[in-house]
Amino acid sequence: RPTGRRFFAWIGNNLSGNRTNLHILKIEKKSFLGGHSIIDTISFSYSDQLDFNSKHNTTSFDCEAFIVSKDSIYMFTKQWKSSKTAVYCLPNQPGHYLAKFKETLDTKGLITGATYLESKKRIVLCGYSKKGKPFLYLLYDFKNHDFLSGNKRRINLPFTFLQAEGIATKDGLHYYLTNEALIRKPVLNIPQQMHFLDLTCI
């Protein structure tokens, strides 16, 4: 979220991976607050997607997590079958593009959120396993925008069952994690919540 810009992404694709209208809206904050919004649209398709007829929740081309760095947008996909994430890159400019595949990371879970503090060169991903166990995945000490070239650390969170969905930070040390409501009566009745996480000692 660069200063002065807000990004809203329509990139979820978790049924059959067959959406053809994937896009991100970039809005100038000042224009929005002034009542005359200036909105740029960045639409895309995946450069390596050939199959648009996957069974429900088996696609490798779902995505909920992305970060913005200078002139590029980096997306971390939610690969339902493999429990991995692939990194794709888009220009941070209006237009239609092919999202370029960069690399794959075995997160052993479904990635749902990302936050990046550029000054600290640290990305924190959040997600959950197929058994509902939430986790964080830290990427740090990397070179340039080769996010997987540095250190990596997976942190299991102390929650019994939680569908983690979003993460944010101001200082790269203290984080806010949100979870989705999950109701499966009579077994589950988990409300939407926000959790504070202190990663100072990590």
Residue positions per predicted region:
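Sequence/structural signature of beta-propeller domains
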Residues: 1-202
